[in-house]
Amino acid sequence: MKVYLVGGAVRDRLLGIPVQEQDWVVVGATPEELLKRKYRQVGRDFPVFLHPETKEEYALARTERKSAPGYYGFICDFSESVTLEEDLARRDLTINAMAMDEQGNLIDPYQGQRDLEEKLLRHVSPAFAEDPVRVLRVARFASRFHHLGFKIANETRLLMYSMVKQGELAHLIPERVWQEWQKSLQEKNPEQFILSLRSCDALRVVLPEINSLFGVPNPHQYHQEIDTGIHSLMALRASSELSEEPLVRFAALVHDLGKASTPIQDWPKHHGHEEEGTKLIRALCARLRIPNDYRDLAVTVARAHLNIHRVCELRPNTIVKLLEQVDAFRRPQLFHKILIACQADAESCGKTVVYRQTQLWNEILSECVKVTPQTFIVQGYEGKAIKEAMHQSRVACVERIMTSWKSNEK
């Protein structure tokens, strides 16, 4: 029985970046042997075990053979005779197909170290095409390592394109699409996930709602970048500079989703795209089973972003109603996320923007939350009268703030 460190831990060690988790491959052993050594089996489809002390994952070396279309269409062999090289051969990219023995010696049968040095994301073998999830994984690694200068190898991009044309991506299950997309939203360059999928025509299949934004014009006076798809990616890029939260980044990306569904004869104007966008976001989230907190924030940003931008043009009563509608008084942290997504939208319009709306909205909210029910209860207000009195008191707060704000602007 021999044990090897494999995959991402080896890759990240060679890159000199922090190792998040360690995975191990066991060669020349059986499940029974590991169980005798107090390892705990957790793998359902193939034997994966947790170390009795470190709780790190140890998997028996295995091979995979395609037996049917899709993610689950594989026959696995995890017998004692499977070699380390055979196990590494089934992996997606050469940079993920390296191992280290217990003495720290590198085992690199597929030139992963060379591709690390050349900053290339290259598939290990033609077997890459047997698993459609690998297209998504390559796009995710592109988003993770873009800041280090990594590119997808031309031959790998061509293979991904071929997989799309052959219809292999039709077998992707919704959970895996979202799993890879969500992971990419946590990377340094989440926009590269979308760009990588688009470069091999996979975006059209996997995320048609986003793909349809490319080629949709925007009014030039607001968007120097013109194209709605490009603007959406710029908003995603801007949001990743402002926040590490994937919820905010997702909301920034899909805030203009409705623009592709507005009447073509009205372009580049997009009247009503806010409400149209909320429908598309709900449908997208239902299709990919995206969590409700992502959906709810994205829907709110899509619906409210124009009014958030135009705060100085709104009546005080409208401002208070908006804050009530987005539940800002009870959930100010949620409103903060909305503001970040809106700021990302404003900063992605192809010109230098100082988004003072954030300061103004925060000032308004901080004053309005000081209005509490107790003030009116002691005055004898009851039921709906309390709510109405609070609303009017908040409107008065906004009037004072807006008057002061506008006088300072002169």
Swiss-Prot record:
E.C. number: 2.7.7.72, 3.1.3.-, 3.1.4.-
Organism: Legionella pneumophila (strain Paris)
Function description: Catalyzes the addition and repair of the essential 3'-terminal CCA sequence in tRNAs without using a nucleic acid template. Adds these three nucleotides in the order of C, C, and A to the tRNA nucleotide-73, using CTP and ATP as substrates and producing inorganic pyrophosphate. tRNA 3'-terminal CCA addition is required both for tRNA processing and repair. Also involved in tRNA surveillance by mediating tandem CCA addition to generate a CCACCA at the 3' terminus of unstable tRNAs. While stable tRNAs receive only 3'-terminal CCA, unstable tRNAs are marked with CCACCA and rapidly degraded.
Quaternary structure, from the entry: Monomer. Can also form homodimers and oligomers.
Domain (HD) ranges: 228-329
Name of the molecule in the record: Multifunctional CCA protein
Any GO BP annotation: tRNA 3'-terminal CCA addition
InterPro entries per record: CCA_bact, HD/PDEase_dom, HD_domain, NT_sf, PolA_pol_head_dom, PolyA_RNA-bd, tRNA_CCA-adding_enzyme
HAMAP family: CCA_bact_type1, CCA_bact_type2
